[in-house]
Amino acid sequence: METPLLVGLELRCPPHLFNTHSRPSSSLSIPALSLRILTPTAATTSSAVIELPANVAEAPRSKRHSNSYLARKSAISEVQRSSDFLSSLQRLATVLKVQDLNVILRDFGISGRWQDLIQLFEWMQQHGKISVSTYSSCIKFVGAKNVSKALEIYQSIPDESTKINVYICNSILSCLVKNGKLDSCIKLFDQMKRDGLKPDVVTYNTLLAGCIKVKNGYPKAIELIGELPHNGIQMDSVMYGTVLAICASNGRSEEAENFIQQMKVEGHSPNIYHYSSLLNSYSWKGDYKKADELMTEMKSIGLVPNKVMMTTLLKVYIKGGLFDRSRELLSELESAGYAENEMPYCMLMDGLSKAGKLEEARSIFDDMKGKGVRSDGYANSIMISALCRSKRFKEAKELSRDSETTYEKCDLVMLNTMLCAYCRAGEMESVMRMMKKMDEQAVSPDYNTFHILIKYFIKEKLHLLAYQTTLDMHSKGHRLEEELCSSLIYHLGKIRAQAEAFSVYNMLRYSKRTICKELHEKILHILIQGNLLKDAYIVVKDNAKMISQPTLKKFGRAFMISGNINLVNDVLKVLHGSGHKIDQVQFEIAISRYISQPDKKELLLQLLQWMPGQGYVVDSSTRNLILKNSHMFGRLLIAEILSKHHVASRPMIKSRPEQKFRCK
């Protein structure tokens, strides 16, 4: 007798026990079973397959639920529907178990009842009815709306062993990744490991997914992959797919090739998504030879390139400058029905225009419009930018106006493109209209928007408006461009807006970057001109060694004449400390100011006592002025100090500039 072989089994299970969205039933059916029996002989012929009826085991059988089960299910439903769920919860607290409360918590999250979810979670905490699933679900739902609150919930977990539960950790790490906070995510992950977390494959897949979204995510991804063997984790197809996507987004084609080979060695079969990432990595340098080899390899193993791969191949050809082959491939995309939207046309138009082939790009644009290809305006944006680069501002302006009419709502990229075209064409009215349109559509300006406007306002000599726009840009957290700010500082100085110029300088200075030394000197001249000597002193104090000697001398004399008298000694010490040689004129002006204000006696005495130790002495005319007024400062003390000056002056070769400035 031949032994039958079981080759097919289908099991249909009943709904979840506490699925409150399903209709309650008083009976529970036995799962339907469908079997196909094959004998060894029948394995060679399809006619020998014997298939049993699917309803062979479907004898109805009733099952009574316990009173406890029915009470809990009713309580769940009542709390979910209640307008005052906390009161219902308090009344039914003895009936509901932790798992029941978790069902309600998840229902609140799915329904978007965020405030109710938080209140329920806090109630569960207060009553000690909480589990790993509670924390994991709550963090997941709260983190989708407020990552800071999710972190607060995680940090509030009192039990250390619960805090490093892998499911809870994965939930909070996923929240951080989805909110673009990879650095914070990695720091928290490192802390979790120190506290005893045993990460699993989900943990690493979550972190690797975050590396795709950030600049220079490749080194961090490699570091994470290096941890896998230590944690007993092997890379699977999903993880390889993520790593290949990271390689592609960072232009690491050789590394992507190595990972593909490693996959094959480990017994994984790369699929079309893995190959798509490898192909994308070739697009960075336009390596069309390797791209063609890859396409040939794929076809040889039966993989048919999809829309994404063919579009990526088009990108490779364009980057490699193969425009004839790009046109041929675009035709193939059209034939396959893969060019129903504007993206492949835009890629080719952009490549042609940047290669100086504007008319060919225009031809593609007109062809696309003629075929009625679906467009969101991105193609218009490409052409407007191309026309601006070729200084064909009139055509760019006309196309921008056409775009405004055609597309009622535009994205920020398109708005910036049209704004730039109007600015380049000098169309102030259109510029103002575009800014109003952005406000009406609640579109927040980005770095490019601000840069375009500031440059335009400077060109139109609207320097205070350019300054105000720079303030707005800085307040939004955008990084200021030094060259543009330097130009604005210069023009603000020319219109005697010295305080505004200093404000722009400070925004640059405090943006955690090194600025060119010429800018320190430029702002110093502007501040001296505006008699903003206290601000000028700050510039000199922080950057004296990067400022030329003539400019330091100019600042020193200006400060001695009209700067804050209480800072005179400090200024002289800063100038000396920078290597600047202070001349007698500056000392004479400072001493004359002190003598004219007897209440500054201590400052005069401090200056006179400091000078000999640094190699400075008063000249004869200044000495006579001091002696003449010595009764105000103490004759004996003045005589003692001046005697030290006399002793220090003996080895010196006295020199005196011809021109002297005296205070009136």
Curated annotation (Swiss-Prot):
GO molecular function, one term: mRNA binding
Superkingdom field: Eukaryota
Ranges of the PPR repeats in the UniProt entry: 165-199, 200-235, 236-270, 271-305, 306-340, 341-375, 376-406, 411-445, 446-480
InterPro entries assigned: Pentatricopeptide_rpt (IPR002885), TPR-like_helical_dom_sf (IPR011990)
GO biological process, one term: chloroplast organization
Keyword Ribosomal protein applies: no
Gene3D superfamilies: Tetratricopeptide repeat domain
One Pfam match: PPR_2
Main location: plastid
Any one Gene Ontology cellular component term annotated for this protein: chloroplast
Record's keyword annotation contains Oxidoreductase: no
Keywords from the named record: Chloroplast, Plastid, Repeat, Transit peptide
Transit peptide interval: 1-72
UniProt subcellular location: Plastid, Chloroplast
Family the entry assigns: Belongs to the PPR family. P subfamily.
Name of protein: Pentatricopeptide repeat-containing protein At1g10910, chloroplastic
Species of provenance: Arabidopsis thaliana
